[in-house]
């Protein structure tokens, strides 16, 4: 059983760098997901439970299941109030999966009370057969705060003494666009490498926090291996840096003006 959470805050507030005041929050929607999976020879069935632990209702809630190129959508829930719960079961074909571990994605699209769209995302693994644990890992996920664009830097390590050809994918909700597709990397024995992705803010609002997921996949002896890592994208306002810069400029000008007045005063005393 796996779960995921995404939070979105809405509100108006005054941001004062010099005084340290933070933005006021008028309401929040926090989507939590729990999944139960069943994999057969032909299909993957996912039972999804969605709850809202925020204090604002989510509207037009639509769950989506994706496995490789397959997609299924659950029935829409018109409104998910605070403390509310919805449950859906979705099925996608899985007869093209060989032995090993494979990533699947569950997304929940919804709107706030102003009909602004958001999406929550969770990624997990399903297992076919009895594969050994994967011999790769994402040891670090480094994400700079997202304004208009940002970088996601992943440390990927080979945990075996053989060269490894792997595919690295970054999964993000629709609010955030990942530039480019999966990165193909070749890892030397026991080596660690950095894989970077650029992300772009499409519809994410300032103050939102979004989980994103990195998947490292490779083939070994006819078995498909996949490992996952998670990071958090924090959406910042580009304007938040302007008051800080202005504060420093104004402060420097004031100090210069005071220093000039002091010099003039000393000069007058010396003349007198």
Provide a role label for each language-model segment.
Residues 1-11:
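Bacterial N-terminal signal peptides that target proteins for export
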Residues 39-43, 82-86, 100, 146-149, ...:
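Solvent-exposed, conformationally flexible loop/turn segments
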């Amino acid at each position: 059983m796996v779960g995921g959470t995404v939070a979105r805050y809405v509100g108006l507030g005054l941001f004062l760098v010099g005084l340290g005041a933070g933005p006021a929050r008028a309401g929040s929607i926090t989507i939590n997901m729990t999944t139960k999976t069943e994999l057969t020879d032909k299909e993957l069935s996912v039972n999804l439970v969605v709850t809202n632990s925020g204090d604002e209702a989510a509207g037009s809630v639509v769950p989506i299941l994706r496995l490789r190129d397959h997609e299924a959508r659950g029935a829409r829930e018109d409104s998910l109030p605070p403390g509310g719960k919805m449950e859906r079961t979705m099925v996608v074909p899985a007869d093209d999966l060989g032995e090993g571990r494979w990533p699947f994605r569950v997304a929940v699209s919804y709107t706030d009370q102003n009909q602004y769209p958001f999406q929550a995302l969770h990624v997990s693994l399903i297992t076919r057969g009895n594969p050994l644990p994967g011999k790769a890992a994402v040891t670090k996920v480094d994400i700079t705060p997202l304004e208009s664009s940002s970088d996601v830097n992943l440390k990927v390590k080979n945990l075996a003494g053989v060269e490894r050809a792997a595919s690295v994918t970054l999964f993000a909700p629709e609010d955030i666009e990942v530039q480019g597709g999966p990165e193909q990397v070749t890892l030397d024995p026991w080596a660690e490498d950095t894989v970077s992705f650029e992300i772009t803010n499409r519809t994410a609002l300032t103050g939102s926090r979004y989980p994103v997921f990195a998947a490292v996949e490779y083939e070994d002896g006819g078995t498909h291996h996949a490992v996952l890592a998670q990071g958090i994208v924090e959406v910042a306002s580009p304007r938040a840096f302007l008051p800080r810069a202005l504060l420093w400029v104004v402060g420097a000008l004031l100090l210069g003006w005071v220093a000039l007045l002091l010099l003039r005063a000393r000069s007058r005393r010396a003349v007198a």
